[in-house]
Amino acid sequence: MPEATSAGREIAIRTGGRVRRPNSVRLRRINILVGALSIPLFVCLWELVSRSGTVNMVLFPPPTVVAAAVLEWIRSGQFFGDLLASLFRVTTGFIIGGALGILLGVLTGQFPVISSLLSPLFHILRPIPPIAFVPIVILWFGLSETGKLFLVVWGVFFTVWLSTHIGVQKVDRGLIRAALMLGTPRRQMLQEIVLLGALPYIVVGLRTAVSISFYTLVAAELAGAFAGIVYRIEIAQQNLQTGQVMGGLAALGLMSFIADRLFAALAERIVWWR
């Protein structure tokens, strides 16, 4: 019995204090295997359905045709130019919208007067989708990059503002009062108590905004562009190049997925105590 107990303790220590049961380990491996096979199975099913004759291959091309269209897109030299144009719009819009969202979220969350002034307006504007602004953005900015960035900033800003606003309001008011009573400068109090306390909410809002920035990219490039992934999708659709349309959609989805994974890894380092 003592030997069994000591062995159990050793296993617990090696697994971080938790004894992993064989069933849970097996289930985890099965889940990983299923996840790894899901995409290949989907691609195979797609290929079979497309070539079965039950659908029009021109409108629903198989993955092999889509892959060939993407390779041709890359060989033409246009792909990387389109990729960089879209990434520039997403990244710049995300940075500007995120920074404005955090700044105004802290102000409206911390100061009731500013909240009373701005929050009603923001709540009215927030539900308006960026694509609804495409006609007026073209009138205001023409086909310049400013209009495209405006649309991405619009989509990112309200998501980050709302999460920051809620996060700041969730900070313990007792800590703030105690810090001010002890003579802590207001700027230091905002940085070390308010911002730090709201940080988990801010990070969640920013991660959500990563995906939203790609949604709004569609509206931005439909507002008139001469390069970009969505622009190329639109041109391919007009020429009935369905393979390139689907290839562009796949590229857009992959870009969004990679950006989300990278931000999730960064978020784990930023909010390490959660």
Report each predicted region and the residues it spans.
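C-terminal transmembrane helix and the adjacent membrane-cytosol boundary/short C-terminal tail
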Residues: 112, 169, 200, 204, ...
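Transmembrane-helix boundary motif in ABC transporter permease subunits
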Residues: 92-122
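Transmembrane alpha-helices
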Residues: 150, 154, 186-220, 247, ...
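Transmembrane alpha-helical segments of polytopic membrane transport and secretion proteins
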Residues: 1-38, 261-274
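Generic hydrophobic transmembrane alpha-helix motif, especially the helices
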Residues: 123-159, 166-167
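Periplasmic/extracellular loop-to-transmembrane helix junction in inner-membrane transport proteins
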Residues: 16-28, 51-96, 235
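Short cytoplasmic-facing helical segments at TM-TM junctions of multi-pass membrane proteins
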Residues: 163-205, 229, 233
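Glycine-rich helix-loop "coupling/hinge" segments at transmembrane-helix boundaries
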Residues: 138-139, 168, 215-252, 271-274
